[in-house]
């Protein structure tokens, strides 16, 4: 029987056509224009899973409003480290996106980014005191210097009139406000990046192609077996470097690669839903992303927020997310994803993480059992005058939280974004969820420094990095003048505040 398998060779294979692969592919192509890249996506369109506008909050995560990035320590003080790191990362994204706009590599910035103030909002004496401490801990840093805090009823009304409707002036309320917050349509941005990328010489983008097997060969290169889902055609791709950026599908692919660095990793899927406003009059009254405090045991991705969104030119209003449990790793995945991901090398970490996260399990069970009335009750904590007839339930994206082996051999549930790479730098994979897309550029720059260690040190690559990201190699929070210069430049190019 003849072997009809198609064979191809490239220097880089990217698995998954989301924001991460788009970012990595574009940066590599800028650094080395003759590099040969193949991209494989199992769906028929780019950015249809985690990167799609309706599947994520669209918050330009800068830690301006997300309280889970500023935990309260045992002594009552606030640790700002993670918030500063995320804010720095988003500034890097702004610089790279500005470069793409200036070079006409992506069309008008209005298609993917808009100015929307970022706010944190709390009620009750204890939470008001926490927010005040958080404000003091952050505002002393140049990167958060523009933040304002208020407990004044009229000021809060001015910032978020819809949220304040139906409230009494003597309620214990507080909010912080950052005028320079953004709403980002990562789906539109990703598709624009791929539209540019696939027109370049040496880049091929394959839709409806699913990766079935990955195997490292003796010469350290990789053989990848792929099936064209529309025709059944088999393909073998040979490459020097593989990046797995397949969202919830990354963990099963990492397991197929069978590298020591991937042993002990597991995944815990968390699904999401939004309440979406259907009344244009209500939508028009709100112009902010207002984040609250997560309930006890809730995963950080489930911090409730009432969000102004601008999707495909249309203003929208969402509240959520409401978490749920599904054994799928992708919205378009299989119910067998979770059971099939359990292997001998991650069974103990998976069981241990489950045992140590009883509050999370309890929280998810409660969320799954919620009735429409329960969801409206949650919404009315933020919008006291909300009417059921103005809101409908929409399905959001699927997230897979990382479970990794702890020092004691047990499992630790991680709530961030994690990059794993092999010691030889030939394979890298991105696992996890928030802050994800917002920090894609910083994550991919770090990945390149780990996996392309010799090239990144060359004067040519370093100069190009500085052209794409002017603050490359520097931190901004300790350089107020450079920070102000970068913000002014990127705001002008991206047409934001």
From Swiss-Prot:
GO terms for molecular function: 2-hydroxyglutarate dehydrogenase activity; L-malate dehydrogenase (quinone) activity. SUPFAM superfamilies: FAD/NAD(P)-binding domain (SSF51905). Pathway: Carbohydrate metabolism; tricarboxylic acid cycle; oxaloacetate from (S)-malate (quinone route): step 1/1. Its cofactor is FAD. One of its GO terms (biological process) is tricarboxylic acid cycle. It catalyses: (S)-malate + a quinone = a quinol + oxaloacetate. Pfam families: Mqo. Its EC number is 1.1.5.4. Keywords: FAD, Flavoprotein, Oxidoreductase, Tricarboxylic acid cycle. Belongs to the MQO family. PANTHER family: L-2-HYDROXYGLUTARATE DEHYDROGENASE, MITOCHONDRIAL. This is Probable malate:quinone oxidoreductase. The lineage of its organism: Bacteria, Pseudomonadati, Bacteroidota, Flavobacteriia, Flavobacteriales.
């Amino acid at each position: 029987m003849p072997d009809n398998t198609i064979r191809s060779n490239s220097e880089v294979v990217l698995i998954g056509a989301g924001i991460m692969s788009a970012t990595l592919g574009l940066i590599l192509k800028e650094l080395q224009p003759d590099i040969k890249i193949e991209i494989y996506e199992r769906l028929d369109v780019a950015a249809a899973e985690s990167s799609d506008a309706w599947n994520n909050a669209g918050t330009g995560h800068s830690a301006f409003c997300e309280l889970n990035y500023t935990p309260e320590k045992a002594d009552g003080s606030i640790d700002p480290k993670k918030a500063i790191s995320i804010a720095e990362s988003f500034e890097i994204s702004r610089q790279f996106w500005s470069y793409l706009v200036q070079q006409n590599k992506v069309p008008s910035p209005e298609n993917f980014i808009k100015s929307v103030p970022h706010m944190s909002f709390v009620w009750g004496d204890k939470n008001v005191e926490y927010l005040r401490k958080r404000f003091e801990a952050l505002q002393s840093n140049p990167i958060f210097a523009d933040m304002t805090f208020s407990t004044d009823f009229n000021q809060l009304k001015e910032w978020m009139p819809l949220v304040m409707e139906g409230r009494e002036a003597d309620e214990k309320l507080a909010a912080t406000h950052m005028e320079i917050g953004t709403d980002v349509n990562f789906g539109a941005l990703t598709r624009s990046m791929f539209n540019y990328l696939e027109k370049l010489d040496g880049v091929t983008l394959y839709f409806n192609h699913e990766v079935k097997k990955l195997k490292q060969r003796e010469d350290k290169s990789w053989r990848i077996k792929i099936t064209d889902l529309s025709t059944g055609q088999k393909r073998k791709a040979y490459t020097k470097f593989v990046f797995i950026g397949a969202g919830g599908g990354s963990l099963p692919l990492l397991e197929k690669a069978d590298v020591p660095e991937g042993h002990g990793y597991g995944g815990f899927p968390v699904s999401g839903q939004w309440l979406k406003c259907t009344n244009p009059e209500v939508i028009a009254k709100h112009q902010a992303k207002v984040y609250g405090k997560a309930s006890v045991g809730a995963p950080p991705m489930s911090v409730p927020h009432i969000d102004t969104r601008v999707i495909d030119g249309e203003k929208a209003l969402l509240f959520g997310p409401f978490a749920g449990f599904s054994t799928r790793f992708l919205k378009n995945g299989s119910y067998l994803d979770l059971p099939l991901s359990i292997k001998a090398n991650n069974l103990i970490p998976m069981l241990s993480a489950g045992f140590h996260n009883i509050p999370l399990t309890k929280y998810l069970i409660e969320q799954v059992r919620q009735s429409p009335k329960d969801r409206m009750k949650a919404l009315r904590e933020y919008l006291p005058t909300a009417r059921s007839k103005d809101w409908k339930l929409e399905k959001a994206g699927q997230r897979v939280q990382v479970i990794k082996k702890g020092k004691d051999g047990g499992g630790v549930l991680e709530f961030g974004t994690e990059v794993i790479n092999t010691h030889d730098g030939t394979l890298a994979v991105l696992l996890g969820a928030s802050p994800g897309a917002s920090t894609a550029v910083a994550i991919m720059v770090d990945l390149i420094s780990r996996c392309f260690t010799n090239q990144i040190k060359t004067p040519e690559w370093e100069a190009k990095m500085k052209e794409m990201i002017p603050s490359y190699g520097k931190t901004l929070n300790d350089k107020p003048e450079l920070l102000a210069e970068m913000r002014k430049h990127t705001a002008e190019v991206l047409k934001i505040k």
